[in-house]
């Protein structure tokens, strides 16, 4: 081992030790999924032949995060079926580890206003998710007046829109949507998964769009789904992910970033602990205040989630 390699390894080890030795900050996980594979009629996701086809319940999540100081979670709906909004609310009502849900409704649907009014009566219903999911065409929909009217209703209700699965086109569409509905509270999920294209001009334009979004009030990003496959392998070293995380942090700063695991979908790329370790090692050296913002404070502003347990923090 040469001197440069030794110093690099020592620095990484020092960062890891410092992060793990820092005061335990309470964590609100803003991105988990709940489903029951034994439900009559089956479920739309995950697929039966996949590695995560095992029921994901609040009890299982609570057991999974024991000892990690994860004190609450927001469920992000993983089904396009209308009735599953109520199913999740019923499941969450029984376990205070769940602080709220982002449901699945179609803003352009004829009954959207009625459906939104129904679910908004439940304080655990924090908003809806719409984006690159369930074969939906966000670009086309975001040009439809009826869709825009639905998003305006969402904003008027003081609820949040979560986007799904970022692309350069989706980022451009979200910026345009924010222009049309300035009071919309927007959370862009899984931003570390945004892959650059082969076109440098497209990437430059996307960077400009992100910087524009970062200037708008009520825009947040999830530093979630961080672990990713590269050439068939999933790196577990924080240093590998640092350049992409640095870019996000440089654009959005400490006040707009949120923690989310994407559990159990994250199990495709590593354990819950492995994913958490990477973001803890990245954020903890930034200091207590910045880490608290990432792990729980910003999530209050983004979601207005419900404190249901004494261990859950409140600003």
What label would you give each PLM region?
Residues 83-97, 187, 241-250, 272-282:
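Short, electropositive alpha-helical surface patch
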Residues 32, 78, 191, 262-263:
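Active-site metal-binding loops of divalent metal-dependent hydrolases
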Residues 5-20, 25-30, 54-72, 246-247, ...:
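Mid-to-C-terminal alpha-helical segments outside catalytic/metal-binding sites
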Residues 27-37, 188:
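Histidine-centered catalytic micro-motifs
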Residues 140-258, 307-315:
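Catalytic pocket-lining loop regions of alpha/beta-barrel enzymes
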Residues 58-62, 85, 89, 113-117, ...:
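Generic structural signal for well-ordered alpha-helices
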Residues 81-169, 175-176, 222-228, 233-235:
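Active-site gating/metal-coordination segments in enzymes
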Residues 36-71, 121-136, 184-185, 195, ...:
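Active-site gating loops and adjacent loop-to-helix segments of metal-dependent hydrolytic enzymes
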């Amino acid at each position: 081992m040469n001197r440069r390699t030794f110093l690099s390894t020592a620095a990484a080890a020092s960062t890891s030790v410092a992060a793990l030795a820092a005061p335990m900050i309470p964590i609100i996980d803003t991105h988990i999924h709940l489903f029951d594979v034994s439900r009559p009629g089956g479920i739309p996701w995950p697929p039966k032949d996949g590695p995560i086809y095992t029921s994901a319940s609040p009890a299982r999540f609570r057991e999974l995060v024991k000892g990690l100081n994860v004190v609450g979670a927001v469920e992000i709906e993983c089904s396009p079926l209308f009735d599953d909004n109520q199913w999740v609310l019923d499941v969450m009502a029984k376990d205070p580890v769940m602080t709220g849900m982002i449901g699945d409704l179609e803003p352009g649907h004829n009954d959207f206003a009625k459906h939104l009014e129904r679910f908004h009566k439940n304080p655990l219903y924090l908003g809806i998710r719409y984006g690159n999911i369930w074969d939906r065409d966000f670009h086309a929909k975001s040009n439809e007046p009826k869709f825009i009217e639905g998003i305006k209703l969402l904003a008027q209700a003081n609820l949040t829109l979560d986007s799904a699965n970022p692309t350069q086109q989706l980022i451009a569409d979200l910026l345009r949507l924010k222009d049309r509905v300035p009071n919309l509270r927007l959370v862009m999920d899984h931003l570390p998964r945004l892959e650059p294209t082969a076109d440098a001009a497209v990437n430059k334009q996307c960077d400009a769009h992100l910087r524009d979004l970062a200037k708008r009030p009520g825009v947040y990003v999830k530093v979630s789904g961080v672990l990713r496959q590269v050439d068939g392998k999933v790196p577990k070293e924080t240093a590998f992910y640092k350049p992409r995380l640095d870019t996000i942090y440089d654009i959005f700063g400490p006040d707009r970033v949120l923690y989310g695991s994407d559990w159990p979908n994250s199990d495709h790329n590593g354990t819950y602990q492995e994913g958490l370790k990477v973001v803890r090692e990245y954020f903890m050296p930034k200091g207590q205040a910045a880490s608290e913002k990432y792990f729980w404070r910003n999530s209050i502003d983004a979601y207005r989630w419900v404190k249901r347990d004494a261990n859950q923090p409140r600003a």
